[in-house]
Swiss-Prot record:
Transmembrane intervals: 137-157
Protein origin, superkingdom: Viruses
Topology with respect to the bilayer: Single-pass membrane protein
Protein name: Uncharacterized protein R557
Keywords in alphabetical order: Host membrane, Membrane, Transmembrane, Transmembrane helix, Virion
Places the protein is found: Host membrane; Virion
Originating organism: Acanthamoeba polyphaga mimivirus
Amino acid sequence: MSQVTGFDQSNVAQYSSFDPLGSLEHAGSNLGNFIQRNNPFPSLSQSASHTFDDVRSDSGKIFDELKSEADKFYDDAKHGLSDIDYRDFYASDPGNTVLRASMQSPYLNSYMDINNAPNVIPLQAPPIVTNRNSKDYNILFVVVILLLLFVAWRCYVNKR
């Protein structure tokens, strides 16, 4: 039986009223129309709609005001930083010269001539300690080389 009884010759009329995309596209409007037709409280829905619109517009205004305030604060801060005269931090009067020299000195804020031995009192001199850093780095280097040799050996053993 090549043709189903009750359908057209090409057997496609059964799908003529089935439009899933169209029904999805119109679902929202159909629901809105249904609610408007059967709504027992039309004034309530209108006031709720107006209230929602008012809240949305007010929140938009508040957001815009906050954004403009933040932009203004950022611009003020940026211009305030750019208006700083950094030459004030490098003044050449004796007090600032002494202060700057003492801040850059490793000898406990001494601004005396440290190349002259009588000027260096023991509290201003850095502690004398033996230098063990080179030994530590030599050991670290040996450990790393041994680790690399071990990894290479394990890779070689696993490939055999």
